[in-house]
UniProtKB/Swiss-Prot annotation:
<keyword id="KW-0067">ATP-binding</keyword>
<dbReference type="GO" id="GO:0005524">
    <property type="term" value="F:ATP binding"/>
</dbReference>
<dbReference type="InterPro" id="IPR006195">
    <property type="entry name" value="aa-tRNA-synth_II"/>
</dbReference>
<keyword id="KW-0648">Protein biosynthesis</keyword>
<comment type="subunit">
    <text>Homodimer.</text>
</comment>
<keyword id="KW-0436">Ligase</keyword>
<comment type="similarity">
    <text>Belongs to the class-II aminoacyl-tRNA synthetase family.</text>
</comment>
<keyword id="KW-0963">Cytoplasm</keyword>
<dbReference type="Pfam" id="PF13393">
    <property type="entry name" value="tRNA-synt_His"/>
</dbReference>
<dbReference type="GO" id="GO:0006427">
    <property type="term" value="P:histidyl-tRNA aminoacylation"/>
</dbReference>
<dbReference type="InterPro" id="IPR041715">
    <property type="entry name" value="HisRS-like_core"/>
</dbReference>
<dbReference type="InterPro" id="IPR015807">
    <property type="entry name" value="His-tRNA-ligase"/>
</dbReference>
<dbReference type="GO" id="GO:0005737">
    <property type="term" value="C:cytoplasm"/>
</dbReference>
<dbReference type="InterPro" id="IPR004516">
    <property type="entry name" value="HisRS/HisZ"/>
</dbReference>
<dbReference type="Pfam" id="PF03129">
    <property type="entry name" value="HGTP_anticodon"/>
</dbReference>
<dbReference type="InterPro" id="IPR036621">
    <property type="entry name" value="Anticodon-bd_dom_sf"/>
</dbReference>
<dbReference type="InterPro" id="IPR045864">
    <property type="entry name" value="aa-tRNA-synth_II/BPL/LPL"/>
</dbReference>
Length: 422
């Protein structure tokens, strides 16, 4: 026997037993973003490596250690996208969507990062992104946060997530703060681990979100970024907080929240859960007003967020909220000469007249017992039984597979009966 080929580590199959919950989560997300008037955009999975180096930052963990990068046959360096914002901005610039325009976009699809696989963190993961271009006020920042809050309510997880936000100011303000932070960290080198020492000179703000308890302890006395903010960033953040207060959205200001990508400025936020252990961030985003210009477009304000579908699915499973509609509503059982095609015609008629009804025909023969067992296995609520007598009388036996009751009715009446299931 030939050796079995396994899936790549950290890249998982989504099996039929899981896909119904995925469809529920993805469908709910699409309904919510559409309710705000946002339009879908679809970008390639593979982009030029230079795009991510320029957008995310060459000294970030993503670019240095986590990207799947390769050369094609022309010698061009290509990368499987590790996130969606850079590609969305590239598409907007290339297709003339951004200059002097307002765009509200969303996308969904697989992303790739070479990380150590663990619960809630995978090498291929599915991300939903929402991006707004051309608006620079705190009102659109607030709308995005309100959108995520609505999504949590729709999914039933709103009591299990909390919002943290911060302002990291302008590039100039951060540059001044960066020097002050480095000076502080240099006074505590004996406490810093190797990762923090490396970040101290490449991306010192990332030291603020370290998980090392000893480093966290000294950071209590570190300079505060809020004390270095420019006046415009302070006013923008105050306006955002005022709007969230008016909307009744609870939040916590976390002055150590900086996000992991270099393109952010001003607003940054995360939705966090305590139910998934170390992988507690279910959604993160912020403002990136300089990225469009950085990637070759005209200066355009922008803000957005992203969330991982796997993590949302895992959270719903953990909270036992994974109740989804069965995959089959009615199962057609046929026994006797000439009954197969009659059963298929009945199923087609029901699909046409009852939108959303899921009807499965039995194939492969077998007696009633075998077919009813199969109907149970697929989770059908009702069996529709057609034998030679039913075809002669133009009737059908409708059996409730949950309660066991059954009744015989004219085939023309079955449509109304099954419509009650939807």
């Amino acid at each position: 026997m030939a050796k079995q080929i396994q899936a790549i580590r950290g890249m998982n199959d989504c099996l039929p037993t899981q896909s119904a919950l995925w469809q529920k989560v993805e469908g709910t997300i699409k309904q919510v973003v559409s309710a705000y008037g946002y339009n879908e955009i679809r970008m390639p999975i593979v982009e030029s490596t230079h795009l991510f180096k320029r957008a995310i930052g060459e000294v970030t963990d993503v670019v240095e250690k986590e990207m799947y990068t390769f050369e094609d046959r022309n010698g061009d360096s290509l990368t499987l996208r590790p996130e969606g914002t850079a590609g969305c901005v590239r598409a907007g610039i290339q297709n003339g969507l951004l200059y002097n325009q307002e765009q509200r976009l969303w996308y969904i699809g697989p992303m790739f990062r070479y990380e150590r696989p663990q619960k809630g963190r995978y090498r291929q993961f599915h991300q939903v992104g929402v991006e707004v271009f051309g608006l620079n006020g705190p009102d659109v920042d607030a709308e995005l946060i309100m959108m995520t809050a609505r999504l949590w309510r729709e999914l039933g997880i709103n009591q299990h997530v909390r919002l943290e936000l911060n302002s990291i100011g302008s590039l100039d303000a951060r540059a001044t703060y960066r020097e002050a932070l480095i000076a502080f960290l240099e006074q505590h080198l004996e406490v810093l681990d190797e990762d923090c020492k490396r970040r101290m000179h490449t991306n010192p703000l990332r030291v603020l979100d370290t998980k090392n308890p000893a480093v966290q302890e000294i950071l209590v006395d570190a300079p505060k970024l809020s004390e270095y903010l420019d006046d415009d960033s302070k006013a923008h953040f105050a306006g955002l907080c005022e709007l969230l207060d008016a909307a009744g959205i609870e939040y916590q200001v976390n002055e150590r929240l900086v996000r992991g990508l270099d393109y952010y400025n001003r607003t940054v936020f995360e939705w966090i859960t305590e139910s998934l252990g170390a992988q507690g961030t279910v959604c993160g985003g912020g403002r990136y007003d300089g990225l469009v210009e950085q990637l070759g477009g005209k200066a355009t304000p922008a803000v957005g967020f992203a969330m991982g579908v796997e993590r949302l699915v895992l959270l719903m499973e953990t909270l036992e909220l994974a109740d989804v509609r069965r995959s089959v509503d009615a199962y057609v059982v046929t026994v006797g000469e000439g009954t197969m095609m009659a059963g298929m015609k009945l199923a087609e008629k029901l699909r046409e007249n009852v939108p959303g009804l899921r009807v499965m025909n039995h194939f492969g023969g077998g007696n009633f017992k075998k077919q009813f067992k199969r109907a149970d296995n697929v989770g059908a609520a009702i069996a529709l039984v057609l034998g030679e007598n039913e075809i002669a009388d133009n009737t059908v036996v409708v059996k409730d597979l949950r309660g066991g009751e059954q009744t015989t009715m004219a085939q023309d009446e079955v449509t109304a009966k099954l419509a009650e299931l939807i």
